[in-house]
Amino acid sequence: MAYYLIDFENVKSRGMEGVELLAEEDTVCIFYSDNADSMTFDLHRKLNETKAQIIYHKVAVGTKNALDFQLATYLGYLICEQQREGIHPDYFIVTKDNGFTSLMVYWKAQGVPVRITRNLLWGKNPTAEQNPAAEENAMEVTESTEQESCLLYTSPSPRDS
C-alpha cells in the first residue's frame, strides 16, 4: 500500500509514468493548478486503466509555492489519519523540486518513511537510483539532527551539577 502525492505543476505528465503498474491498494493524489491543468490522451488512457485510486486536488494559486504547501499539509493529514487507523503505508512525493527534501527529513526523524521520486515508475521500484544528492543530503541532515538531539538530552544542565 502506498500513497503517491504528485506535484503536477512540476513533473507534468512525465511524473505519471508507471501509473498503470500500481496496485488496487495504492492511491495517487494529483495536485494541479491552472498553471498545469492538462494531460495527454495517453495519460488519460493510463489513468482509466490503472487499478490505483486517483484523487484530484485542484489548488488555487496566487502565492509562491501554494501547491507545495497544500501538498505538504495533505501529507501530514494522511500520515495522521493512517496512523490513527493503525496503517503504515509508504509515502512518495513525485516531484523534481528539491524543496521537499526538508519535509522528507522531518518525517524520517518521526519514523515515517517519505520518499521523493521523479515519477511513479521509480516510486514503484525504490531501488532505482534517482536523486542521490538529495538522498545524501537528507541523510546528512538527519544524522546531524539526531546528534544534536542526543547532545541536548545527554548533556547535564548547570543546575544538575
Regions found by a protein language model. Name each.
Residues L5-D7, T95:
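Generic enzyme active-site microenvironment
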Residues M1-Y3:
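Extreme N-terminal starter segment of soluble prokaryotic enzymes
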Residues D34-E148:
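Nuclease catalytic cores that cleave nucleic-acid phosphodiester bonds
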Residues F8-G15:
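Short acidic, Gly/Ser-rich segments with clustered Asp/Glu that frequently serve as metal-coordination loops
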Residues G15-N35:
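A short alpha/beta connector and helix-capping loop motif
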Residues Y153-D160:
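Conserved small/polar residues in nucleotide/adenosyl-binding loops
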